[in-house]
Regions:
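Conserved anion-binding
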Residues: 51-56, 60-160, 175-179, 192
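Glycine-rich phosphate-binding active-site loops on the catalytic face of alpha/beta enzymes
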Residues: 23-35, 78-93, 147-157, 200-227
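C-terminal helical cap(s) of enzyme catalytic domains, especially alpha/beta-barrels
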Residues: 39-45, 92-107, 207-237
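N-terminal basic/disordered segments at the start of proteins
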Residues: 2-22
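Conserved, mostly hydrophobic/aromatic
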Residues: 16, 148, 197, 230
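Glycine-rich, positively charged N-terminal anion/phosphate-binding segment
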Residues: 10, 32-50
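N-terminal amphipathic alpha-helix/helix-capping segment at the start of soluble metabolic enzymes
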Residues: 1-6, 43-47, 112-114, 171
Length: 237
């Protein structure tokens, strides 16, 4: 299981690398759950991070604007991301979801076939008024994505496990694996959640808050020692 740590700038990225993170995921928490950062921040992080470590970038909790999403996704890929992550916020039907993600995938793959596209849905989909995440593995497969992910949209202290217990997470992972997708889980994950997440069979877990000082995803900053504690537990056999 890989651990993805989400810095907002090159200083936090350096701390994440020093802590041993598997994937460095550039985001802007001030713009939401999957808030997008600036292209030059992605480039700075890619230049800082050793080539052996993959870089991811979020492009936002996206409304149903397929053209805008495609252009943003291409921008993230050109800026050096190995993964381009799209929060499927505004697409209200399976047809809309497929249309947006198909064009995102086309934009990214025409630039670089090796860049992975991540379709991210929300465990708190009733609150976010988005699609049920269990519908998304099929959308991701049909649209040519590489990874399907579930996160939480509203960051109010509620966690992934408040909306999906470990058995539910495992069912989501199994659905993704049946479609030959990698599966990622995120959503205010704490240190004590890691052993449970390992048992679900997740390929990737995404963390920001637990890696930050005082556990604060907005006011805190990622600390190498916090990342190291997360990594040590994640890599225990």
């Amino acid at each position: 299981m890989k651990v993805l740590i989400s810095p907002k700038d090159e200083f936090e990225a350096k701390a994440a690398v020093n802590g041993g993170a598997d994937i460095i995921d550039v985001k802007n928490p001030d713009e939401g759950s999957l808030g997008a950062n600036f292209p030059w921040i992605i480039r700075q992080v890619r230049n800082l991070v050793p080539q052996s470590i993959e870089v991811s970038a979020t492009i936002g909790d996206f409304p149903h604007l397929p053209g805008s999403a495609s252009l943003a996704a291409l921008g993230a890929a050109v800026s050096g991301s190995n993964y381009v992550k799209v929060g499927l916020k505004g697409s209200k039907t399976l047809e809309e979801a497929f249309f947006l993600m198909h064009h995102v995938t086309r934009a990214v793959k025409e630039y670089d076939l090796n860049t992975k596209v991540v379709l991210a849905g929300y465990a708190d989909y009733h609150r976010a008024e988005t699609l049920d995440p269990f519908l998304l593995p099929e959308v991701a497969r049909s649209a040519g994505c590489d990874v399907v992910m579930v996160d939480t949209f509203i960051k109010d202290g509620k966690r992934l496990f408040d909306f999906m217990d470990d058995a539910c997470c495992k069912r989501f992972i199994d659905k993704g694996h049946e479609k030959d997708l990698e599966v990622a889980l995120a959503g205010s994950i704490k240190l004590q959640d890691i052993p449970i997440l390992k048992r679900t069979g997740a390929d990737i877990i995404g963390i920001r808050g637990a890696a930050c000082s005082h556990g604060d995803r907005l006011a805190g900053a990622i600390q190498a020692e916090n990342v190291r504690a997360l990594m040590d537990l994640a890599k225990q056999s």
